[in-house]
Amino acid sequence: MLTAATNAASSCSGLLIPPSNALITYSLASGGTSVAALFMAGYIPGIIWALCCCVVGVLLAVKLGYKGTPGKFDWKNLGVCTLRALPSLSLIIVVIGGVFSATEGSAIAVVYALVLAFCYRSINLKSLWKIIVDSAKMSGMVVFLVGVSNILGWVMAFLQIPDAVAAALLSLTSNKYIILLIMNVILLVSGTFMDVTPAILIFTPLFLPICQSFGMSTIQFGLILVYNLCIGNITPPVGNALFVGIKVGRTSLSKVMPYMLMYYVAIIGGLLLVTFIPAVSTALPQAMGLM
């Protein structure tokens, strides 16, 4: 259960750290915000997310009484293990090396992983069919969840719900901190049942002008938006990453959620840093001359 929760919670940091399709989508939705600046801005929030997961993971491991490998650290053993792991680690280069598109890289990575599995003798022809069936079930689950979230996004846009929400938000208060808190709540809730891409396309033109009216940069808002939607990606009822983690871990939502609650608290703490400290998302782009 802890493994499934840890994998699910940490997985979405990849949407913040380049290369990120979510940030590219936001660049288009916001009218051409610099992709290079967004990529550079994503590093610190992504690292904050990862550190939050590290802290919670250590605390949970200590609480559950997990112990490290017995014996002292051995550099020679590290080298041997690294060499043995190189074929598997090369899979990362295949996926994010930039040689293929995201879709092509995924397909090639599957073939590469399949060949490695046979080489390591971790699977055989008899077990291959079961693996294919399980993969088909998991893919079907993800496609269904994405389809439902896209339908909900279309319904919200058709009924002009986001416009009504934005108008109500401005009528409540002119305090930018309260507006940001309410905006975060709206994005967090919406992210739990909407896919990242339609949510970015719907909420960027609504909330970006509001944030710009009190001096927030398009870079900071983009990171706030994507960070919120990343949290939604690991939160029921849709939570694509969460349910994939549960499926891979062969566990259930009821068993994983007690661990996920601690991750939510830590990650939302990171969200507050991104929201109320502009330097978290703007320091690196400014230092690199991208803003």
Model-identified regions with their sequence ranges:
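Alpha-helical transmembrane segments of multi-pass membrane transport proteins
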Residues: 1-291
